[in-house]
Amino acid sequence: MWTLTCQQFIALILLGTLVPSESFLCKHCFRKNLEKVHESFRDILSPPIFGVNPQPLIEVQQPKVTPKPESSQVIHVHQPQVILKPIYYPKVDTISTKNQIGIHGPYSQYPSLLPSANLLGIPNQQLINAQDVLSDKDQKQTQVQNNNLHIRFGVSALREGRNNPSLETISRDKVDKISPALQLQLLRYADSQSQSQTQSQSASQSESNASSQFQAQEQSNRLLENPPVSESQSQSESQSQSESQKQSQSQSQRQQQIQTQLQILRQLQQKSNEQSAAQSASQIQSQRQSDSQSNLQLQEQSQSQSEQGKPIQSQIQILQGLQQKELDDKSASQSQSESKTRQEQQKQLNLQQLEELSSSLSQSRLGLGQQIQSQLQKNQLDKQFASQFQSQSKSQLEQQMQLQLQSLRQLQQKQLDEQSASQSQPQSQVAQQIQSHLQLLRLLQSRLKTQSALKSDLEQQILLQLKKLTEVQQKQLAEQPTLRPSSKSQSPGQLEQQILLQLQNLLQFQQNQLKSDTQTQSQLQESKSNSLSQSQSQSQEQLQLQRDQNLRQLEQIKLEMQNIRELLQKGKSELQTQSDSQRRIHELYQNILQLNKEKLSYQLKQLKLKELEDQKKSQAEISKGSNPSNLFIIGQLPSEGKPAPGNQGPSIEPKLVPQPGSLDKLPSGGGLIGKPASTGLYILSPDFNDLSDYRDQFRLQQELKKHQNILSLLQRRQNDIKKQQNAQLLLGQQQKEQQAQESINKQQSSSAGSSSQTKLQQDIQSTGAQGSQQGLQAGSTGLQTSSLQGTESSASQSAALQRLKEQEQLRIQTENDQKTSSSSSHSNSQNSQSSSSQSSQASQSEAQRQEAGNRNTLLLDQSSSKTQSESKSESSSQSSSHSSSQSTSNSSSNVQSKLQGESQALLNNLSG
């Protein structure tokens, strides 16, 4: 998980939630947003320290996000976030001289005490040490006040306030220049200082007068009661003089410090503006005069006090000690209040940080939900594209197959036309031969009048045979035009069956002819030799032409078959890619479901833990509720049912909050936090747990809607697949029925023509040895290819081999029979050879067709075995295609069933 790539990805996600979507690609806005992010991180790491009276916190105005109309018409408007920082306006009042002077005016520390104090037996050294300690405290307080004077009149250049947003540091270039506002503030400060000094002088004069009167009265009383003691008076006078000297020294030090500060300010004023030099000089002179007057007055007052205020020194010192204690208590209480306010501010900042973190987490969750939505939409689009691609590929394959079938049919028509043209020529030759035969018969009839009965029978038989031949030829001529339109719908196997039937009829006719013409063969030997020479010369030329044509056609058929195979391979590869894509989609969907399950379980665990923690906290708070000193109010209660102005949220509940001592005891909710009040023990704060629960429920509803949409799409896809499967099953049943009918017809034809094939093979082997060799090669290749298809093809191959062996044995027997019967069969040889030439030509054309059929549909034999193997191979290929389609459909159905089961389980979990 924590590799570099993962860390970068997580950082991008977190930054993307903080940056708005519009300005993500704009460089200007991106820089501004990054700077804002840096500032927020700095504030989190080093929070600012506010003063005693904190102003309202920073308010951030969210930018107005305009919707994107189109990518071509986007006009980017720069609307940065406006951050309203609080501006602290310092009070331009007189300097509070409570810490310097006290509540009832200035006070001075005298070294001597009353004789009544000495009567108690306190040594003078201890009193002097106590006075020194008090004077040290005063000096420290004055130093602190002198250092903090710039806070009172807003001179921000003298303080380094990094964490305070209200204090702005002035650059070094701008130090020499003083604004007119600062000049006015300096003048006001000088006036206020002079006024405060005059007030302090008047107060000190009044006190000195009162003390002098009181001392005079006491002295008069003492003189009346006791005679004066010269030594004690001289000692007290010396002590008072030393104390007055010390006081004058401290006052001179203070005056020197004030003068140094004023000199610095005057130097700044002189550097600021040359125009205001005269005015500032006059003001400085007036201030100097006022300072000198105040110093003189203070000296006079000190002298008068040293002369007059001796008897009240002890009381004043006691009052000073009490005042200092009170001041110390006040300062301690102020420091405590300041620490409390700082702690409250830190708590506020921490709560704000928690709120920001919760908002960022919610935004990140929303971003993740949007990413999951986009991924699901992409998956749906991919599925739609895949289905469209499947339909398009199927339609393209069907179109290509139809075009190739049309081209094959056209080639078959051309072959039939050429065969009819080639057959028309031997038919004319046959007619001429028949005429010659008739002439010979007439001559024989004239010679053999004695044997009229036998000759009449023979003539009748020959005439019947000739009539049958003519009828057969007429039938062939009549059947050829009828075959042309039907050839488009008939397969090459059916055409071969029809041709085999015709050849069987011819062979039967020839057998009858041979039986009846054994007697007439001796008479027709001469005509036979002549007709043989002519027919052989003509048949050789025709055979060569037909062989050339057949070779060309075979090459064309080979090319077309290669194209068909390539298309089939492409279709298989496309099906494989589609199945792979479906598997990937299924795996992605399963991963998404697992993630959703884990999220749901994690959220349930968190909710349970939160409930337990809330219960524990509520119990602890109820147990602590008896001590009201541990609790205080944060925020303000709404009056008369009105909600609090700053609170936001769907539900507001009162909660008990402990005293702010540690951040670990803070509640989970947040709200507006202000000063502690003593009117009650409850606060108003929105419960963020309820908000998170509401958001989780909303997200769960969205996820349920997504799953329902996916299920509806999958059900539609399943219905389409079922329709396709039903159509394929109907086509397969129709093809099986056609194949069954063809096999029945072929079996009948093979049983009827098994007797006639023996003599056909003699003529075929004598004239077409090359065709038989090619057929055997094609049969061997067909056996090799069909051996992979199953047990049915192996059985057909063994049967075909047995038939070939039987045919070879029959051929050897017929050759022996022909050698023995050649001497006695010369009479009717012309008719037999003419029919044999026709049969040989037909057999050659058949052999060439069968070779093409062997390469197209893997036929093994020249007889019905080839057609049967074709039908079986077609059925096996169809069954394999059906099985592949069924396997794909089964896999798709399995995927759909799994998806439905998982979706139902999710629904049950959510409902539970």
From Swiss-Prot:
Secreted recorded as keyword: yes
GO cellular component: extracellular region; extracellular space
Biased composition (Polar residues): 851-861, 898-912
Protein modification: Proteolytically cleaved by the seminal metalloprotease Semp1. Cleavage appears to take place in the mated female.
Cellular compartments annotated: Secreted
Impact reported for E613K: In strain: SENGWA30
Phenotypic consequence of E231G: In strain: WSII6
Molecular functions per Gene Ontology: hormone activity
Primary location class: secreted
Tissues expressed in: Detected in the male accessory glands (at protein level). Produced in the accessory glands and secreted into seminal fluid.
Low complexity: compositionally biased ranges: 193-220, 230-255, 271-324, 521-544, 732-757, 765-785, 821-845, 862-897
Effect seen on changing S335P: In strain: SENGWA30
UniProt GO BP: mating plug formation; negative regulation of female receptivity, post-mating; sexual reproduction; sperm competition; sperm storage
Signal peptide: 1-23
Keywords annotated in UniProt: Behavior, Secreted, Signal
UniProt feature, compositional bias: Basic and acidic residues: 803-818
Effect of E307G: In strain: WSII6
Cited InterPro entries: CTLH_C
Effect of L507V: In strain: SENGWA22, SENGWA29, SENGWA37 and SENGWA51
Bridged cysteine pairs (disulfide): none
UniProt region (Disordered), positions on chain: 193-255, 271-349, 518-544, 638-671, 732-912
Role this protein plays: Responsible for physiological and behavioral changes in mated female flies. Associates with sperm and localizes to specific regions of the female reproductive tract, including the sperm storage organs. It accelerates sperm accumulation into storage but does not mediate the entry of the first sperm into storage. Once sperm storage has initiated it seems to act as a guidance factor helping subsequent sperm move into storage, a corral concentrating sperm around the SSO entrances and/or a trigger for responses within the female that accelerate storage of sperm.
Name of the protein described by the UniProt record: Accessory gland protein Acp36DE
Organism: Drosophila melanogaster
